[in-house]
């Protein structure tokens, strides 16, 4: 089926969203749909032992170890890194998606149980057309479409099958932070699960709060 779009960034964005929303849902009970889960031989399974260089030149090796008994969970939504040529990525992780886990998230496994779903993000190629450039257009460009739906479905699976009442931290960057912000707004804020949210580390985006306040509101 052909979809005809006018030649504007906004129209192309809407077409991509329509295309993405027609795709089938992921089954997040399948371990292959997760880049990281507790105890898995996956993208978080990395030796992050570090050599610390003191001001006087002394070297100290700091051994890295995960904590399988960590008291909280971390749920991570990674940034725009997919090199797939399509508007949205597929469910086969490319090297960039694996690398960003190691660079940004794996170290958190020393403090929390890791959960990082693979999701069909808007790719680097898709960004050329997926973000509206119209003057005055505001809002969250990733708040609808398969990229959001995947993360929401993974989150709901995690809550139902893995959380078991534990505290959690949301960690996200760039596109992931936009999605996580919307996830908080729709699925967490004002609901019982909010009491379990320890923190949200949302990098590469901004959060609106009520005038005169420094907390509250998404």
Where would I find each of the regions flagged by the language model?
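Sec/Tat signal peptide C-region and signal peptidase I cleavage site
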Residues: 18-22
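Short, well-ordered amphipathic alpha-helices
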Residues: 101, 179-188
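Positively charged n-region of N-terminal signal peptides that target proteins for export
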Residues: 1-4
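Gly/Ala-rich beta-loop-alpha elbow adjacent to hydrolase catalytic centers
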Residues: 172, 176, 180
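Active-site catalytic motif of lipid deacylating hydrolases and related acyltransferases
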Residues: 32, 38-40, 67-70, 76-167
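N-terminal module-boundary/linker segments of secreted carbohydrate-active enzymes
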Residues: 23-61
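Bacterial N-terminal signal peptides
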Residues: 7-17
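Surface cap/lid and interfacial helix-loop subdomains adjacent to catalytic sites
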Residues: 150-164, 185-218
């Amino acid at each position: 089926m052909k979809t005809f779009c006018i030649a504007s960034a906004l129209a192309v964005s809407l077409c991509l969203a329509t295309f993405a929303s027609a795709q089938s849902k992921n089954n997040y009970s399948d371990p292959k749909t997760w880049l990281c889960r507790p105890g898995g031989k996956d993208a978080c399974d990395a030796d992050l032992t570090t050599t610390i260089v003191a001001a006087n030149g002394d070297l100290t090796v700091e051994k890295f170890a995960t904590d399988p008994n960590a008291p909280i969970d971390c749920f991570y939504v990674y940034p725009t890194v997919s090199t797939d040529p399509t508007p949205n990525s597929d469910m086969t992780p490319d090297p960039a998606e694996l690398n960003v886990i190691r660079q940004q998230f794996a170290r958190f496994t020393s403090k929390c149980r890791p959960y990082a779903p693979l999701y069909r993000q808007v790719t680097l190629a898709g960004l050329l057309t997926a973000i509206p450039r119209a003057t005055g257009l505001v809002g969250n460009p990733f708040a609808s479409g398969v990229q959001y739906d995947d993360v929401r479905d993974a989150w709901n699976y995690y809550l139902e099958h893995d959380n078991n009442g534990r505290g959690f931290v949301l960690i996200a960057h760039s596109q992931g932070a936009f999605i996580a912000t919307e996830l908080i707004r729709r699925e967490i804020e004002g609901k019982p699960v909010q009491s379990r949210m320890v923190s949200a580390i949302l990098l590469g985006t901004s959060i609106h709060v009520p005038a005169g306040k420094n907390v509250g509101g998404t």
